[in-house]
């Protein structure tokens, strides 16, 4: 029942996908004292089950993705129990399922490379997130706070989707408080 409601609220009359947030739109309409009035959602029954030793890590923003992963990583203090080669140049550098030729330094905090090919011809600074980059020999220099996502389009083409590390990924494009690549768009 709840999933069907979520699907209806996320889809427009013509089937287009609407911006409907699971936490701020859906979640706040649940419970005995909801902060959002929506009669249909308010009528749902909700149960909260506490988990023994449960913890919550928020992955809603670029910064939270890194800070939450650092918090999980730092649950293990015995370095012998961590499976990696050498010592990380900074605890907030994360590389997974990737090939890279980058020599990281302590001046490279908040780096995330996932499902990507990042050769030594790339220069990273800090607060850079790189995802989906195919094998390449490009010479690229990312300024602080610039992130890159690459998605396949068809069989042989790629779409580059740059964004800012602190971009909220929401907001009216005419509003000066809405940012893209760390700058106001309105």
Name what the model sees in each region.
Residues 1-186:
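Left-handed beta-helix
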